[in-house]
Regions:
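Glycine-rich, acidic/polar active-site loops that bind/position phosphate-bearing ligands
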Residues: 1-280
Length: 280
């Protein structure tokens, strides 16, 4: 895990992926091996959110096609293998003043600004209700469990990888907020809209965040929906998100996901047969 040498096994595949990305002008930064078996992390350079969503969309298609050429399958499923870490799409966000080019998350003296804290407050207040937008499938919620390198709540902290909202170590101009809740299975366009909408509401309403989590956030309670059905209910009950994202979009999205959830509920899992068939 986290090894440059571990990537060598996949050198032919990744050389081809890099070639494709260069030709498509996708701004890929680094590639490292992650904790899971055959799990890789790709980082993109910072960019305009819409342009970056375009890049992520094309990158996913590129990786899948390149993998097939090497007799492999690439998946962006949130939790494809039990007992292995899931896959996320962490989104780092900062806001730049168009007139001055200054990062509004930092004061002139280099300290964190009120806008920085209000943005975090908005993420904490609204991410639970917006969860279904970035955890769009029943499998998405299997990733979000204790001690699996995925968050279970929306605590925030500086360089704390157990929280849902992290502020990485950086210079004042590069101060940013990382949303660690979003899964690799999320639509990048919807993910960008979701996290920006939550942060925007925090700025608009001057929402103060909870005190910073200094320790292990896994010791704190769950504060995110535990299933697709629960997440759908939470989004339906949040009028502020309806207003920002559009009522028609929220209605159509939740109705489609409700149909998918209904189909899932018709499936009887092997776990249920193993534990219940001859024991109840």
């Amino acid at each position: 895990a986290y090894s440059i040498d571990a990537v060598n096994e996949f050198d032919p595949l990744f050389e081809e992926i890099y070639d494709y990305c260069e030709k498509m002008e996708l701004n890929v930064d680094t590639l490292i091996h992650e904790v899971g078996a055959g799990q890789m992390e790709i980082n993109f350079f910072h960019a305009h959110p819409l342009g970056l969503a375009d890049e992520v969309f094309f990158f996913k298609r590129t990786v899948r096609e390149a993998a097939l050429r090497h007799d492999m399958y690439a998946t962006f499923m949130a939790k494809p293998i039990a007992g292995e870490p899931g896959s996320a799409m962490h989104v780092h966000q900062s806001i730049i003043d168009k007139k001055t080019g200054r990062n509004i998350f930092s004061n002139e003296d280099g300290t964190a600004s009120e806008a920085f804290h209000h943005y975090i407050g908005g993420l904490q207040r609204y991410i639970p209700a917006a969860m279904v937008l970035v955890a769009p499938y029943v499998n998405s919620y299997r990733r979000l469990s204790r001690h699996t390198a995925a968050p279970i709540n929306i605590e925030w902290g500086h360089d704390n990888r157990t929280v849902g909202i992290r502020s990485p170590i950086s210079t004042p101009q590069a101060r940013r907020v990382e949303n660690r809740v979003i899964g690799a299975d999320a639509n990048p366009y919807v993910a960008m809209a979701m996290t920006l909408a939550c942060g925007y509401l925090g700025l608009k309403n001057k929402i103060k965040p909870k005190p910073e989590m200094k320790g292990d956030a896994y010791l704190a309670p769950y504060s995110l929906p535990r299933s697709l059905g629960e997440a759908l209910d939470w989004l339906r009950r949040e009028p502020d998100l309806h207003e920002v994202l559009g009522k028609e979009f929220v209605t159509i999205y939740t109705e489609i996901k409700e149909l998918e959830f209904d189909e899932f509920m018709k499936v009887i899992s092997p776990w249920e047969r193993e534990h219940l068939l001859l024991h109840v």
